[in-house]
Amino acid sequence: MKRTYQPSKLVRKRRHGFRARLATTGGRKVLAARRARGRKRLSA
């Protein structure tokens, strides 16, 4: 059985990147929550 995590920078950015977060309402909520918490990194 192969491992489930097969790293790819492109897929990582597209799925969890800043622009991907901004594209949806839920993603914007995620960013707002992370800002409120004072996270150093908001997204991948």
Curated annotation (Swiss-Prot):
Gene for this chain: rpmH
GO biological process: translation
InterPro entries hit by this protein: Ribosomal_bL34, Ribosomal_bL34_CS
Pfam families named in the record: Ribosomal_L34
Organism: Bradyrhizobium sp. (strain ORS 278)
Keywords: Ribonucleoprotein, Ribosomal protein
HAMAP family the record matches: Ribosomal_bL34
Lineage: Bacteria, Pseudomonadati, Pseudomonadota, Alphaproteobacteria, Hyphomicrobiales
GO (cellular component) term, any one: ribosome
Ligase found in the keyword field: no
Coiled coil: none
A GO molecular function held by the record: structural constituent of ribosome
UniProt keyword annotation of Ribosomal protein present: yes
UniProt protein name: Large ribosomal subunit protein bL34
Family: Belongs to the bacterial ribosomal protein bL34 family.
Superkingdom classification of source: Bacteria
